[in-house]
Every structure is written in C-alpha cells, then in structure tokens.
Amino acid sequence: MNIVLASSSPSRLSILRSAGVEPLVCPADVDEDALLDSLVGRSPADKVAALAQAKAEAIAGDYPDDVVIGGDSMLLLDGALQGKPHTVDKTIERWKQQRGKTAELITGHCVITPRGRHVETSTTTVTFAHADDADIEAYARTGEPLQCAGAFTLEAIGGWFIDSITGDPSSVIGLSLPVVRRALYAAGYNVSEFWNNN
C-alpha cells in the first residue's frame, strides 16, 4: 500500500519525504476557479476543504488500494481568501497589502483510503513582517512565492518575512502531518506502515 499525493506541490512532497514517506505523485486536474464559483456563500474552511476533496476524488479511482491525499491551502486576509498570485506583479501587490498584518493560512485535507475518507482543515495564524518595498520586489522576482498560497513560503526565502506563526508549521508549508496522522489512525493504519524503511 502506498501514499499517493494528488498534488504537484514541491512543498507537500518535501513534507512527506522529510517525514519518511516516499509517495507516488499524481497531480489532480481540477478546475479550482469553477469549484470556488460554485461555493459562493460557504465558509473559507468549507471552500478549502472542498478543493482538497475534489483533488483526492479526481484520482482516487485509479488507486483503490492505496491512501490518496488531496490538499489545498489559501490565506484568509482581511476577510478575503487568497490563493496563488501566479505573477510577479500580483505577488508584489499582495505583499504590500499583507505586510505587518496577521492572517490565517487554511489548509484543507482529504485522505481517502480503502476503508473510508477523512476531510479536515487546519488553520494556522501567520504574522507577516513589515518588509520594505525593495525586499518585497526582490522576493517576488525570485519566483518562489508565485505558486504559493498567500504568496509566501515559510521554509525557504519567504521565512525572512514571517514574524511568527501560531499553530502547525507543516500546515503552513502545505500539509499537516497531525491531520494526516489522525486520518490514518481513524482508518486503522499506523503512520509507521508508510515509512520508507518498512
């Protein structure tokens, strides 16, 4: 039995590898914008959980005997959900808006096993530094934050501009190991069954 990651996120892959798991990687093809449009009026946590569930469900049929993990993260800042900025200009704009503020990074998880499914969100509070304009522009031009929820990374260059987090650090990076552990336990699996040395 394998863990299958329904994501192309290098951060999610890195979390699992650092935790002793070498997952199969099978990015799901989900129209995130269309799904979000269909969820108008739902809570931010519901939206992020629905994205994670859609990703896991998109590939679960191809891996009926494995554990499929879908994940999605978005930043809740000033009452608005923000996903990936995708461009340098949008990244600069976002950072000028979020610097010096505190926001919530919401990560949705859907873990599908042969024994059932577990859907859960994890919310971590992030306080952004008062980064100056030159550093914001330089950071955006590295390309690192363009494909990251909230336009930042905690575990790389973006770590310079995060003053504090309250909550699960792995969730901020893209996948909460405590949530995945709870999902595996609920399905009757031990985490150690999926470590590389077993």
Swiss-Prot record:
Family matches, as InterPro entries: ITPase-like_fam, Maf-like
Disulfide feature: none
Cofactor(s) listed in the protein's UniProt record: a divalent metal cation
EC number: 3.6.1.9
Catalyses which reaction(s): a ribonucleoside 5'-triphosphate + H2O = a ribonucleoside 5'-phosphate + diphosphate + H(+); a 2'-deoxyribonucleoside 5'-triphosphate + H2O = a 2'-deoxyribonucleoside 5'-phosphate + diphosphate + H(+)
Residues at the active site: D72 (proton acceptor)
Family: Belongs to the Maf family.
NCBIfam families with a match to the protein in the record: maf
PANTHER family per record: BIFUNCTIONAL DTTP/UTP PYROPHOSPHATASE/METHYLTRANSFERASE PROTEIN-RELATED, BIFUNCTIONAL DTTP_UTP PYROPHOSPHATASE_METHYLTRANSFERASE PROTEIN-RELATED
Record's protein name: Nucleoside triphosphate pyrophosphatase
